Amino acid sequence: MLNFLPLDARHKLWRLATRILPVLAVCQLIPFTDAAEREPYDDRYCTTCHGTDGRGNEGIEAPRLAGMEDWYLRRQLENFRAGIRGYHPMDTAGIAMRPMAKLTDDSIADIVAWVGSWDYQPAEITTEGDVQSGELLYGVCATCHGMDAKGNAAMGAPALAGQNDWYLVTQLSNFVAGYRGRHEDDRYGQQMAAMVGTLTDESAIRDVVAYINSLEAR
């Protein structure tokens, strides 16, 4: 079934699958129904992977949702549903997310509103890097995400400060490698893919994330 994937992607996906298969098994028992029949969304959906407090789970590469902008969360759920995100065979965490995002518009609206009610606290710092070097590299990022990394809705750029740093490292690495942002319908992802050219290696990625960590989260 996974023979279309490169060997290293298959290995990574299987490792990830052993952690999330129990979650997927539970979710198979929970139908996504129409608006008249839906039940309130609770830990059966998002919190099983993203945490009961919405702060994320590094072990299964599930980022924090608490504090995420409603418009950005909506866009990502819609992208997963449309196959715009999580389509690349090397984006193993994205592939794992796609079955979880087969939602109606009303379901997405419910989830976005529910997540928006969670308390927000900045994520713990787990990534080390050269903050001074990262500050220089972040100049390109600031064009869209702002000098304070608090995001810019008009640019479609989410806040970076306060997000799980391991998640930022993973996603920047995916953009650099071409695993994310290459779908022809991913307008904002394509913009990101074009902007990460200055991040030439893992050290540069960690440096810029270390600088983001040094900024005050909202």
Region annotations inferred by a language model:
Residues 43-46, 62, 70, 94, ...:
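Disulfide-stabilized extracellular ectodomain repeats and their linkers
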Residues 1-15:
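N-terminal secretory signal peptides that target proteins for export/translocation
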Residues 17-28:
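Bacterial N-terminal signal peptides
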Residues 44-82:
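The feature marks the first
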Residues 58-64, 80-108, 124-129, 153-159, ...:
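Axial heme c-ligation environment in periplasmic c-type cytochrome domains
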